[in-house]
Amino acid sequence: MLNKYMGLIISLFSLGACTQLMHQQKFSVKGDYPSFTYQGNDIYAGAMNLAWNELSQSIVKAPIRLDSADSQVQAQVYNYNHPVFTAKDIESNSYYIKSGRGQSIVDTINQEVKVKFPHKKLADLQLKLGKDDVLAYAYLAKAVQYQTPFAQTVMNFSGKKVKAMSATTAAMRANLALLDYHDNNDFVLRLRLKEPTEELYLIKGHDQASIKEIVSLIKTHGQEAALQNSDHFKVPFLSLLAKNTHPDLVGKRFLNQGFENNVIGVMIENIQFQMDEIGASVENDAVISMVSMSAPSAQQPKDLIFDRPYWLVMKMKNAVTPYLVIHVRNSQLMKLVSTAQ
């Protein structure tokens, strides 16, 4: 059963080193995860769910309503008002949530989050707020390690040579639990981690599936199987620094009673993710401001080679929703190998 995931879902692309990309909004489907798209790769991150919940519960005191006839906007509002990820899906020492009014709340957040997460890499908030402006903020961080480090290697992904990791010893293969296998282009793997409360999945295939369908797939997997000595495993390193500014929601007026003269001033989420032969880490923060409208199977050897689009899911063992899901579609998030190597 899917339990504790990373509050992030990403449909990845190719990248040589850590790349920050411009936002592209994904088509919103009512009832699905509120994801966005970076160069053809879909990302869901849990911090925005936490920030939206904080604004809704602590400030507005009701589900948020926005003034828009755009069905895509309303689908996003619905999805955020019916969150797939809440604070119950991650332990308290992995997140920080705060809301308040005026410039003092920005200063308080910047100070408090550094105390709780002294190794935070994402930038401090730089917002300037009026005394009546409202801010809701959420931050989460996770880092996991495989039980045994993998070997570094290179591989081809969609025609490009990228840095990768592979299992070359019995101890490395013991990191991998095969949950479902139809063929070399359709299978589900779980990576065994040092952290007993965390889970990380890799799913190859299901290119047209929604995030909701991928989460359901993991929940319904069968009995785990160990890899055989003749089986092969490779997956690319990943590196991501992304920002979503929600341009379709910024400027929309609130319809909630008492907030009709306010609009969304800023709605930003930042995601930093790394995956290599040692483990994986994610940082994710989200901020929403409310401002006045006057302001701005077979015994044959299996080749478990992730050389085509695949999914990655990270969660806590007993949570309902993942905190990280990545659909890797191309090599934009990978570390390209120079032709000289």
Positions of the model-derived regions?
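Bacterial N-terminal signal peptides
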Residues: 7-16
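Bacterial N-terminal signal peptides that target proteins for export
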Residues: 1-6
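Hydrophobic-core positions in well-structured secondary-structure elements of globular domains
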Residues: 19-341
